[in-house]
Amino acid sequence: MRAVLLAAATAVVASLAGAVPPHKPKTNHPILGTWIFAVPETDCEETYYMRQDGTTLVTSGAEVAESVYEIDDEPTAKGFYRNTDRIVKDNGKPDCGGGITKIGTQVTNYIRFHPSWNMMIICRDESLDACFGPLYRLGGESS
């Protein structure tokens, strides 16, 4: 019985550890806040709540998802911030594109901010060849 309880406790701790980002963004990171993306040629909008604790809340169409993320403190020589994001919760409903995101999905993107810090684009790599956006800042972290 004791071995079963120990195994169960270990499993719970391991699952919780997976939800904690290894590196939280610095307190004045430009990613922090609420960002809006109007999906082209649709009436659909995505909202990204980028929190100081390294978690996000994203709404896209009927989808509501939560993730953990890590973003570089400083941009690369090319001006991009490397961002890794992993889905930890999802309501299983379709996003603006009709897709359903699976829990555990992880992506790495490269973010480039406008000099005003109020707009950004999200790119597949450190170039402007495959990006989406712009996303517009709505307010601070708590909004």
What would you call each of these model-derived segments?
Residues 40-43, 60-126:
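Contiguous, well-ordered beta-strand patches that form the walls/edges
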Residues 7-15:
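Bacterial N-terminal signal peptides
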Residues 48, 66-71, 132-138:
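Short amphipathic beta-strand/extended segments with alternating polar/hydrophobic composition
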Residues 31-65:
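N-terminal secretory signal peptides
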Residues 140-143:
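Short, solvent-exposed mixed-charge patches
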Residues 20-36:
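N-terminal helix-cap/turn-to-beta initiation motif at the start of protein domains
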Residues 50, 102-103, 129, 137:
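Secreted/processed peptides and extracellular or luminal domains of membrane proteins
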Residues 1-4:
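Positively charged n-region of N-terminal signal peptides that target proteins for export
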